[in-house]
């Protein structure tokens, strides 16, 4: 059963009517309603296209959080052959909110690292809804260092509402872990491609997303804080989330204009969750293209290009 968002109610009504008519036709073949079904399907498709062509920032937040949106393990399952997960930070323990491992991607060895939110209740609990603890970032550091040692490129997929803010995270220095993970990204001597596939919130996302090339799916979001958090801090109210989402310029389109990201990957009409396999394949194509563009650079050039890219942020309008 498809999950509809609040702003999709008119679409849900039309698609629901189409399903009702199709069931009626199955129950009574003598009923001729083919033309009516076709008209409703066209109307629903047009409404879906018009709706997604003019989404507000807050509506994009809702799409980025859609429960059926493909997650890290969905991408790994369809893009990576012989994936071997690697667990533990070798300091404290294992954190399932960040998953990483080696595999074959389009004929080459690649280290894949990313946030996993989980797709059902059991999975969400296991992966802590994609909110990583310190050991998750320290595991990412370990895997990136391993990839560098063997000259293997790294691909990271960010999808988190933020690092886990619990007491145990603070006791084990989550801020320090994120800072060191960010530094490891910036100093890595192999190509690093980062893709924001859903939510990219705060240091929790940045800690694994400082790539040579940073890509975002069309309806994903990327920001230092969630709209709810910004509303609470700036307006002392939970009623200003829509205003916060607009003011912070958290959409892929805004961030591309500002030079924060390098590329926006178009999503199927209706979002990545409607055509999961298509979205995953096209994301894989983009990753392969970006890796090919970096394969001739030596380690020093890879580091220099990446650092210059991030140091240049914020200079737009000042030169």
Swiss-Prot record:
Component of the acetyl coenzyme A carboxylase (ACC) complex. First, biotin carboxylase catalyzes the carboxylation of biotin on its carrier protein (BCCP) and then the CO(2) group is transferred by the carboxyltransferase to acetyl-CoA to form malonyl-CoA. It comes from the Bacteria. Belongs to the AccA family. PANTHER family: ACETYL-COENZYME A CARBOXYLASE CARBOXYL TRANSFERASE SUBUNIT ALPHA, ACETYL-COENZYME A CARBOXYLASE CARBOXYL TRANSFERASE SUBUNIT ALPHA, CHLOROPLASTIC. Keywords: ATP-binding, Cytoplasm, Fatty acid biosynthesis, Fatty acid metabolism, Lipid biosynthesis, Lipid metabolism, Nucleotide-binding, Transferase. Residues 39-293 form the CoA carboxyltransferase C-terminal domain. Its EC number is 2.1.3.15. This is Acetyl-coenzyme A carboxylase carboxyl transferase subunit alpha. Pathway: Lipid metabolism; malonyl-CoA biosynthesis; malonyl-CoA from acetyl-CoA: step 1/1. GO terms for biological process: fatty acid biosynthetic process; malonyl-CoA biosynthetic process. It catalyses: N(6)-carboxybiotinyl-L-lysyl-[protein] + acetyl-CoA = N(6)-biotinyl-L-lysyl-[protein] + malonyl-CoA. Transmembrane segments: none annotated. PROSITE patterns: COA_CT_CTER. The keyword Nucleotide-binding applies. It is found in: Cytoplasm. HAMAP family: AcetylCoA_CT_alpha. The keyword Lipid biosynthesis applies. Signal peptide: none annotated. Its main location: cytoplasm. It is an enzyme of class 2 (transferase). One of its GO terms (cellular component) is acetyl-CoA carboxylase complex. Acetyl-CoA carboxylase is a heterohexamer composed of biotin carboxyl carrier protein (AccB), biotin carboxylase (AccC) and two subunits each of ACCase subunit alpha (AccA) and ACCase subunit beta (AccD). GO terms for molecular function: acetyl-CoA carboxylase activity; ATP binding; carboxyl- or carbamoyltransferase activity.
């Amino acid at each position: 059963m498809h999950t509809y968002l609040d702003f999709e109610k008119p679409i849900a009504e039309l698609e629901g009517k189409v399903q009702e008519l199709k069931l009626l036709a199955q129950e009574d073949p003598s009923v001729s309603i083919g033309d009516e079904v076709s008209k409703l399907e066209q109307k629903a498709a047009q409404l879906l296209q018009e709706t997604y062509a003019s989404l507000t920032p807050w509506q994009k937040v809702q799409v980025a959080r859609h429960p059926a949106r493909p997650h890290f393990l969905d991408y790994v399952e369809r893009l990576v052959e012989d994936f071997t997960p690697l667990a533990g930070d070798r300091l404290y323990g294992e954190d399932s909110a960040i998953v990483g491992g080696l595999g074959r991607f389009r004929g080459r060895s690649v280290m894949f690292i990313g946030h996993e939110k989980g797709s059902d209740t059991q999975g969400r609990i296991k992966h802590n809804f994609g909110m990583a603890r310190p050991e998750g970032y320290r595991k990412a550091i370990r895997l990136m260092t391993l990839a560098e040692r063997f000259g293997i490129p790294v691909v990271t997929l960010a999808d988190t509402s933020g690092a886990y803010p619990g007491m145990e995270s603070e006791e084990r220095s989550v801020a320090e872990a994120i800072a060191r993970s960010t530094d490891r990204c910036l100093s890595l001597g192999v190509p690093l491609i980062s893709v924001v596939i859903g939510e990219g919130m705060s240091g929790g996302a940045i800690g694994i997303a400082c790539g040579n090339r940073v890509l975002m799916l069309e309806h994903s979001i990327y920001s230092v804080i969630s709209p709810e958090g910004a509303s609470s801090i700036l307006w002392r109210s939970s009623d200003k989330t829509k205003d916060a989402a607009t003011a912070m310029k958290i959409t892929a389109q805004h961030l591309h204009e500002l030079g924060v990201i390098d590329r926006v990957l178009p999503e199927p009409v209706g979002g990545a969750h409607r055509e999961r396999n298509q979205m995953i394949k096209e994301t894989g194509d983009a990753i392969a293209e970006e890796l090919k563009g970096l394969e001739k650079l030596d380690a020093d050039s890879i580091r220099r290009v990446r650092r210059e890219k991030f140091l240049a942020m914020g200079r737009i309008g000042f030169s």
